[in-house]
A protein has these predicted regions:
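Extracytoplasmic small-molecule ligand-binding "clamshell" domains
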Residues: 21-94, 157, 226, 245
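Short loop->beta-strand "edge-of-pocket" segments that line small-molecule binding or catalytic clefts
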Residues: 22-37, 123-139
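Periplasmic-binding protein-like
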Residues: 29-31, 105-109, 193-227
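Extended ligand-binding regions for polar small-molecule ligands
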Residues: 46-55, 116-117, 123-130, 212-246
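Ligand-binding cleft/hinge of the Venus flytrap
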Residues: 49-58, 100-102, 125-127, 135-159, ...
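Acidic, polar ligand-binding/catalytic clefts
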Residues: 50, 63-125, 138-139, 201-208
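Short helices/loops that flank or line small-molecule/ion binding pockets
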Residues: 68-80, 98, 161-184, 189-190
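A ligand-binding cleft/hinge motif common to bilobed small-molecule-binding domains
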Residues: 84-94, 145, 174-202, 207
Length: 246
């Protein structure tokens, strides 16, 4: 009888180890729909890292912060991973860790009301206009953008993309700068909520180029596994399905 109990306990222990998972806390900006949607714990970025790591035995735990605070929480090791990191961000914020391969790409545009009649060809043309961007854009984009923004007395940043939409259509600013998917999402949301009329025509200027991003890990082993699984998602076609879902 004692032997039977011992065998049962060993079997349960083995089963427990097989099905055990390691929780990975991941910091996300809290206002980046459809890339990050805190209310439903999904979105393009969340789905990518979840579907990459969970088959490898990791449980992704999303934690949402005002955009710049995700960096502070990562630096202080309150989280294991931070989203929305590139080489510029690591350099400007003096971050240590292991950066993943490019995992997703923002398409940032300058948006202006068509009635303004702007014909922007270069981002330097924004230097004397009121421009509302997203929090951390100077560090993240860097280079010519950082120079233009730093020298522009009418340049501001916010961690609320919804407020960018409102300010543009209320004619409080000349230009807003943000990702095209985020703009379209919050434009529709603001209109549906009856907050501001967003039906006025808008011009979109691709002045900034694509902004590739990845995840910054404290643990190299987990970063390496993520890179392998990310490639699997891309090779299988699942990555494209995630992008198209939203």
């Amino acid at each position: 009888m004692l032997l039977k109990i011992l065998i049962t306990m060993l079997s349960l222990g083995a089963a427990s180890s097989v099905y055990s998972v390691e929780e990975i806390k991941v910091a996300f900006g809290n206002a980046l729909a459809p890339w990050v949607m805190p209310a439903t714990n999904n979105g393009i970025i969340i789905d990518i890292i979840t579907e990459a790591l969970e088959p490898a035995g990791y449980k992704v735990v999303p934690i949402y912060y005002p955009y710049l605070r995700r960096i502070t929480q990562y630096r202080n090791r309150f989280v294991d991973v931070s989203s929305d990191i590139n080489v510029n961000t690591m350099t400007e914020e003096s971050l240590a860790g292991f950066l993943s391969d490019d995992a997703y790409t923002y398409e940032n545009f300058a948006f202006a009301l068509k009635v303004k009649g702007y014909k922007f060809k270069h981002l330097n043309e924004l230097g004397n206009l009121s421009l509302l961007s997203w929090q951390g854009a100077i560090a993240h984009i860097g280079n010519e953008y950082a120079q233009m923004a730093t020298n522009n007395p009418y340049y501001f940043e916010t961690n609320r993309q919804e407020s960018q939409i409102q300010m543009l259509f209320l004619k409080r600013v000349d230009v807003v700068q943000l990702d095209e998917k985020i703009f379209d999402y919050f434009r529709s949301k603001v209109e549906q909520n009856g907050i501001v009329d967003t039906t006025e025509e808008v011009d979109r200027f691709p002045l900034f180029g694509a902004s590739s991003n990845g995840f910054l890990f404290h643990d190299k082993k987990i970063r390496d596994e993520f890179n392998r699984q990310l490639q699997r998602l891309k090779d299988s076609g699942r990555y494209a399905e995630i992008l198209n879902r939203y």
